[in-house]
Design a protein with these regions (language model features):
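Basic- and aromatic-enriched surface patches that contact anionic nucleotides/nucleic acids
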Residues: 2-8, 15-19, 33, 133-190
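Short alpha-helix boundary/capping and kink motifs at helix termini
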Residues: 2-30, 34-35, 39, 46-62, ...
Length: 190
């Protein structure tokens, strides 16, 4: 009960702080695509005050899309559309200061430390329609996303299952770079 109350208070503080911080920040840029082959695309994600981390996409299966998101805008959107008192083991966002309490946070940290030779899979982001518009739904990679947000990266790419949601997410939290289909991305390889 106290943890839920603490998270509710931290959530309110984060929403106030992120609302005030957005206009003052310089625009985020897309993460650098550092490797592109038939088997993998790898992006370098700068992490403040520590080594960069790397995210990857692999071709195959159903068509997916890469959307480069502004981390602060995405965090605010996800947090404000999550309940004030999130349920445990849900897709709800928690305040940054509570993200490291996720049971898999240490595993995500270890995976990101593996560097460019063993990049981490892009988080998979979905949505559902709500009375207030669209709400964020994490289908895979929630703890990875927590790690990136807790470490205050400026932007990072995510994977999205369909073109319409890629366009919507890009409008809600994108950095101004059009979403790209995996098929188009992997057709660019040399």
């Amino acid at each position: 009960m106290l943890t839920r109350l603490r998270n509710g208070i931290l959530r309110a503080q984060d929403l106030r702080e992120s609302g005030a911080a957005i206009p003052a920040q310089r625009p985020s840029m897309a993460c650098e695509l550092v490797d592109l082959s038939a088997k993998r695309a790898t992006w370098r994600v700068p992490v403040p005050n520590q080594a960069d981390c790397y995210l990857k996409a692999e071709p195959g299966g159903a068509e997916r899309f890469v959307v480069h998101i502004d981390a602060e805008t995405f965090y605010r959107r996800w947090l404000e559309t999550s309940p004030t008192f999130p349920k445990q083991n849900s897709q709800d966002c928690v305040p940054r200061r509570a993200m490291s309490l996720d049971s898999k946070f240490a595993t995500a940290a270890a995976a990101f430390r593996s560097g460019r030779d063993a990049p981490v899979t892009l988080p998979s982001v979905g949505y559902w329609a709500a009375a207030s518009g669209y709400e964020v739904a994490m289908s895979d990679g929630m703890t990875r996303t927590f790690w990136l947000l807790a470490h205050r990266v400026r932007s990072f790419p995510v994977s999205v299952a369909d073109a319409s949601w890629a366009t919507i997410l890009n409008g809600l939290a994108g950095i101004g770079v059009a979403p790209i289909a995996f098929s188009e991305l992997f057709s660019r390889r040399a």
